[in-house]
Each structure stands twice: as structure tokens, then as C-alpha cells.
């Protein structure tokens, strides 16, 4: 089974981070799903109890793969009431030109802000891109590749709701977790906690039971268990701790 896991550690007080295990969300990526039955798959995910659906958008330029555009994402709104999350793994020209369409397509069933993730490597003016997402009614979030230092996002932490740390090179599944990314995650988490920001950290890429142990130990004390019953297909899962205000809670 292919897994795409993310551990999300919000900027709660330090005592909460190091204390009892925090609740988690399960957010599957539909990248490995059957595109011919994507709507049925999204409906199945909602019935399985998932909290949000993640779409990996690739343009064949920024990463060596090609997936779907905003119309495909928007069409899935008819099949589920779950919130969406869109990660734009696309070139700068595509990011700037398509932000309005993707932000609109990612919104919830009642116009709630959907999570729109842009890569810091693809945005010369990252402040402007993130501010535009917020102004257009989205939830601005930033991602950084393994080769990008944590300092690249330090000056935009006050503009985002999430920071996504890629622990493999984006584009294809089946890659090994890069161990040095754990230190990067810890550095970003420390900045968030020290500043008292309400920002979550997502960890994306081959986060399996072994690699998750250290991540959970540093931010949540305990590693997550593997949820095999959430979906029968070889979809990639995201395990995220959530902020206390969110509706569903599960402890691990």
C-alpha cells in the first residue's frame, strides 16, 4: 500500500505540543486513485470518515509528472461535502496565472476557504502570492522541497495557515524518506512556537511508521498508528494533528 503521510503540528503552547497526544485528521491524496472514477472515489472517502481531500496538481515542468487542472477539482465538489486541499507543484508562470481558478475550485461547499499550497521555489514574490490567496478567499499555505532551507519560509510564517515540508523530492511516489528533513521540521516548529503563531506543519513524503516515530516524539510524543481501514485502495494517506477548534478528533 502506498502511503503519503503528513504529521501536522500546530503552534499550540509548548506544553500542549510536548504533553498528551493531540488529535489527528486523515486527509488522503487522490493522486493514485482511478481518474476515470474520481467522483466515486471522493464519495467513498467521505463515507470512510476522512476529514479533507488533497489534490496534487502537477504541470510536467516544476515536477516530472502531469495531473489535473482546476475544472477537475471543481467537478468533485458535486460528489462530496468534504473540504479540499490543493498543492500546486507547478511553475511560477502557472502559479501566478491559475491562482484565482485553483483558489475558487478548492473552496468548500458553502464557500469556506480551502487550503491552497504554493511552493516557495515557484514564487519569486511569495508574499504577494500568499496574500492573493487570502484575498481571494483561500487558506494560504507554503511548501518547500528537500533542497530548500527552512529559512526560505521563515519570513512568511505570519502569512500562512500551513507549512508543508516535502520529505521526498516531489513528482512520484515510492521514494525513501530523507532523514535530514526531520531537523528542518523541528527548526520550523520552533519558530512557530516561539512566535506564538497559529500555523500547522505538514510532513509530506514516505512518512512511514519508522520515520514517524521521531517526528511524533519531537512534536506529539507518540507515533501514529497505521490506519488500514480508511480506504481499500492504494491511496496515500496523510495523518495530521489538528487545532483544538476543529470538529473531529481521534487520538493515537
Regions found by a protein language model. Name each.
Residues 2-15:
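Cleavable N-terminal signal peptides of Sec/SRP-targeted secreted and luminal proteins
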Residues 17-115, 121-123, 132, 140, ...:
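Conserved N-terminal beta1-alpha1 strand-loop-helix module at the mouth
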Residues 42, 93-105, 148-159, 206-221, ...:
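Catalytic cores of alpha/beta
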Residues 133-135, 197:
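Structural preference for solvent-exposed beta-strand-turn elements
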Amino acid at each position: 500500500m502506498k502511503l503519503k503521510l503528513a504529521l501536522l503540528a500546530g503552534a499550540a503552547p509548548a506544553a500542549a505540543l510536548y504533553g498528551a497526544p493531540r488529535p489527528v485528521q486523515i486527509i488522503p491524496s487522490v493522486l493514485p486513485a482511478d481518474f476515470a472514477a474520481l467522483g466515486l472515489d471522493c464519495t467513498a472517502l467521505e463515507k470512510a470518515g476522512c476529514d479533507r481531500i488533497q489534490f496534487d496538481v502537477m504541470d510536467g515542468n516544476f515536477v516530472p509528472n502531469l495531473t489535473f487542472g482546476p475544472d477537475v477539482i471543481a467537478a468533485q465538489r458535486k460528489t462530496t461535502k468534504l473540504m479540499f486541499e490543493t498543492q500546486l507543484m507547478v511553475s511560477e508562470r502557472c502559479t501566478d496565472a491559475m491562482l484565482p481558478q485553483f483558489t475558487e475550485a478548492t473552496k468548500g461547499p458553502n464557500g469556506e476557504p480551502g487550503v491552497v499550497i504554493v511552493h516557495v521555489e515557484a514564487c519569486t514574490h511569495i508574499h504577494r502570492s500568499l496574500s492573493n490567496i487570502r484575498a481571494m478567499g483561500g487558506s494560504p499555505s507554503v511548501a518547500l522541497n528537500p533542497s530548500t532551507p527552512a529559512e526560505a519560509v521563515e519570513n512568511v510564517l505570519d502569512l500562512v495557515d500551513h507549512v508543508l515540508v516535502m520529505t521526498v523530492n516531489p513528482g512520484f511516489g515510492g521514494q525513501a524518506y530523507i532523514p535530514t528533513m526531520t531537523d528542518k521540521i523541528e527548526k520550523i516548529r520552533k519558530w512557530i512556537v516561539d512566535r506564538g503563531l497559529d500555523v500547522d506543519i505538514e510532513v509530506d513524503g514516505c512518512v512511514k511508521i519508522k520515520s514517524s516515530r521521531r517526528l511524533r516524539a519531537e512534536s506529539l510524543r507518540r507515533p501514529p498508528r497505521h490506519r488500514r481501514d480508511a480506504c481499500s485502495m492504494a491511496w496515500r494517506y496523510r495523518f495530521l494533528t489538528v487545532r483544538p477548534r476543529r470538529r473531529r478528533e481521534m487520538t493515537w
